[in-house]
Amino acid sequence: MSNKASDQSARTASILKTDITRENTITRSSSSNNDNYHHHNNINNYNESAKTGEDANKENIPNLEEEIAAFRIFRKKSTSNLKSSHTTSNLVKKTMFKRDLLKQDPKRKLQLQQRFASPTDRLVSPCSLKLNEHKVKMFGKKKKVNPMKLNFKGNLAADSEDVEIDEDEEYFY
């Protein structure tokens, strides 16, 4: 592979070099024709301007090595092997954990569940407090509520707390 890459970079370098020299010769020949046509007597001035033009071209042309480095294409390493080994190791860890968990007695399992409880489980937001209070008012603490059956014969005491709205007043929601 390294031979292919070096051959490819050498080829691109030669192509770039020929393009650069071709552009320089074209600009020199066209400028020399124009200068000879317009200025027959100023040969010395032409040579000086050509030299300064060449110096300017050399400064504008980037180094050949920099251009070769820009055209180098590196092949990406395949990550499929890494992914498969990672997933198999996770699978092995999960199966070992499940086996150990099945061997443990129920008291130990309960301790594990309590240990892995989230610290935010015990925190109660104001919204959830209001919801719990409303549930207690609607359904009572001791009654078991079946969410599949709707009971429309609830207490009327809960309705008395509602705010009465006058029909004459306009409310914007």
Swiss-Prot record:
Residues 1-56 are annotated as: Disordered. Transmembrane segments: none annotated. The modification N-acetylserine is found at S2. Residues 159-173 are annotated as: Negative-charged tail. It holds the Pfam family Spo12. InterPro entries: Spo12. Keywords: Acetylation, Meiosis, Phosphoprotein, Sporulation. GO terms for biological process: meiosis I; negative regulation of protein localization to nucleolus; positive regulation of exit from mitosis; sporulation resulting in formation of a cellular spore. GO terms for cellular component: nucleolus; nucleus. Residues 1-12 have a biased composition (Polar residues). The keyword Secreted does not apply. The modification Phosphoserine is found at S118, S125. Its negative tail is functionally important. It is required for meiosis I chromosome division during sporulation. A component of the FEAR (CDC14 early anaphase release) network which promotes CDC14 release from the nucleolus during early anaphase. This is Sporulation-specific protein 12. It comes from Saccharomyces cerevisiae (strain ATCC 204508 / S288c) (Baker's yeast). The gene is SPO12.
